[in-house]
Amino acid sequence: MLLLPSRGKLYVVGIGPGKEELMTLKAKRAIEEADYIVGYQTYVDRISHLIEGKKVVTTPMRKELDRVKIALELAKEHVVALISGGDPSIYGILPLVIEYAVEKKVDVEIEAIPGVTAASAASSLLGSAISGDFAVVSLSDLLVPWSVVEKRLLYALSGDFVVAIYNPSSRRRKENFRKAMEIVRRFRGDAWVGVVRNAGREGQQVEIRRVSEVDEVDMNTILIVGNSETKVVDGKMFTPRGYSNKYNIGEKRRAERMGASTKGGMEVARRSEEILRSFYPEEGLRGDIIRRCIATTGDVTIKDVIRFVGDTEEGVRALRDGCRIIADVHMVRAGLRRDAIVAVDFARGDDTRTASGIRNLAEMIEGSLVAIGNSPSAAFALCEVAEKHPPRFIVATPVGFVNAAESKEMVRKLPVPSVTTEGPRGGSGICAAIVNCLIEHADRPD
């Protein structure tokens, strides 16, 4: 059978959020050129003033395959514009068009026309919530199992991405939204969230809330979850890209002292340092670390169990070089003044979650600063991993009476500089205090 080439063409057109002013010129030209307009009724209604006199075919929600079949069939003889909200390739209809055309060997010219996404529209309305690396996650489990959605959200949050959340809730999926907010709260605390409803359309609503304040949302809402850098000032939500540091924009950052930066806080820190020096007067980085541990525990005798191996300044150099921090548990990460990857988030198998996570992060361990404040099993796993993938620096202070002392003794035998506690004493707070002291030294001007 002879297959004649198609005389038509299919445009898959992203019309943006809704308003004509946010539609690209190319999208308008494709709609103008088209003989047929095919689409979901809601999207077609948004461009009704642009399609007068054209043949229009609409289908209801969840009839995407029917729309694609109709559009491809018509495009064999006619110019067709298949309408998609936002951008057709981002949670739009374009992937289905391509997949169906390839699988069924449909001989039709297809051209995709990008559109302004809900994420970019919402970010602009909020201020500049998305400015650099970010992730986009849909909470809809109609096409993707919830277990996969949850895993993707976990990785996006653990990577400290700004996260744009599409399809946060519907009448049938309120539970997914609740679960997602619990995950966000676990990773980000009470972070800033931009809540934008009907971006670029009638009924537009723009709010900036804390995670704890986000309650009822619907399918017309997009959420933008800020990362560790995101700020809210004068009603604008923005995530700096680093220009302030590069070009000295704004006030010069005040040097921090024991985590304090305000005038009152600095005075308290100064007085605390005077008292701490009376307990332990040694100068330098090691003296600062021991004093920080005394301040954290309120126990002067903690100085007797802190152990240093190798060049402690290597931890400062590593942080100045921008090395990643890997912590065993969220409690350590919560106390740090820089972001960290948490081993338990990468756990698989029958081993303890921290040990499993450390092993699964083996290649990332190499060259990292590893902070273990809770789990002896994580310290044992680190010693195994370090043979092939040595970290650059280790802080290990797991606490307890089962294997804690033994695991730290193994860490001290590694050819890697480290700070540890001897015996059963330690804990996540001490671990975070030591790492923060290294961070403070790393942040000081040369």
Swiss-Prot record:
<dbReference type="GO" id="GO:0032259">
    <property type="term" value="P:methylation"/>
</dbReference>
<dbReference type="InterPro" id="IPR006363">
    <property type="entry name" value="Cbl_synth_CobJ/CibH_dom"/>
</dbReference>
<dbReference type="GO" id="GO:0043778">
    <property type="term" value="F:cobalt-precorrin-8 methylmutase activity"/>
</dbReference>
<dbReference type="Pfam" id="PF00590">
    <property type="entry name" value="TP_methylase"/>
</dbReference>
<keyword id="KW-0413">Isomerase</keyword>
<keyword id="KW-0808">Transferase</keyword>
<comment type="pathway">
    <text>Cofactor biosynthesis; adenosylcobalamin biosynthesis; cob(II)yrinate a,c-diamide from sirohydrochlorin (anaerobic route): step 3/10.</text>
</comment>
<dbReference type="InterPro" id="IPR014776">
    <property type="entry name" value="4pyrrole_Mease_sub2"/>
</dbReference>
<dbReference type="GO" id="GO:0016993">
    <property type="term" value="F:precorrin-8X methylmutase activity"/>
</dbReference>
<protein>
    <recommendedName>
        <fullName>Cobalamin biosynthesis protein CbiHC</fullName>
        <ecNumber>2.1.1.-</ecNumber>
        <ecNumber>5.4.99.60</ecNumber>
    </recommendedName>
</protein>
<dbReference type="InterPro" id="IPR051810">
    <property type="entry name" value="Precorrin_MeTrfase"/>
</dbReference>
<dbReference type="InterPro" id="IPR035996">
    <property type="entry name" value="4pyrrol_Methylase_sf"/>
</dbReference>
<dbReference type="InterPro" id="IPR014777">
    <property type="entry name" value="4pyrrole_Mease_sub1"/>
</dbReference>
<keyword id="KW-0949">S-adenosyl-L-methionine</keyword>
<keyword id="KW-0169">Cobalamin biosynthesis</keyword>
<dbReference type="Pfam" id="PF02570">
    <property type="entry name" value="CbiC"/>
</dbReference>
<comment type="similarity">
    <text>In the N-terminal section; belongs to the precorrin methyltransferase family.</text>
</comment>
<feature type="region of interest" description="Cobalt-factor III C(17)-methyltransferase">
    <location>
        <begin position="1"/>
        <end position="246"/>
    </location>
</feature>
<comment type="pathway">
    <text>Cofactor biosynthesis; adenosylcobalamin biosynthesis; cob(II)yrinate a,c-diamide from sirohydrochlorin (anaerobic route): step 9/10.</text>
</comment>
<dbReference type="GO" id="GO:0008168">
    <property type="term" value="F:methyltransferase activity"/>
</dbReference>
<dbReference type="InterPro" id="IPR036588">
    <property type="entry name" value="CobH/CbiC_sf"/>
</dbReference>
<keyword id="KW-0489">Methyltransferase</keyword>
<feature type="region of interest" description="Cobalt-precorrin-8 methylmutase">
    <location>
        <begin position="247"/>
        <end position="446"/>
    </location>
</feature>
<comment type="similarity">
    <text>In the C-terminal section; belongs to the CobH family.</text>
</comment>
<dbReference type="InterPro" id="IPR003722">
    <property type="entry name" value="Cbl_synth_CobH/CbiC"/>
</dbReference>
<dbReference type="InterPro" id="IPR014422">
    <property type="entry name" value="Cbl_synth_bifunc_CbiH/CbiC"/>
</dbReference>
<dbReference type="GO" id="GO:0009236">
    <property type="term" value="P:cobalamin biosynthetic process"/>
</dbReference>
<keyword id="KW-0511">Multifunctional enzyme</keyword>
<dbReference type="InterPro" id="IPR000878">
    <property type="entry name" value="4pyrrol_Mease"/>
</dbReference>
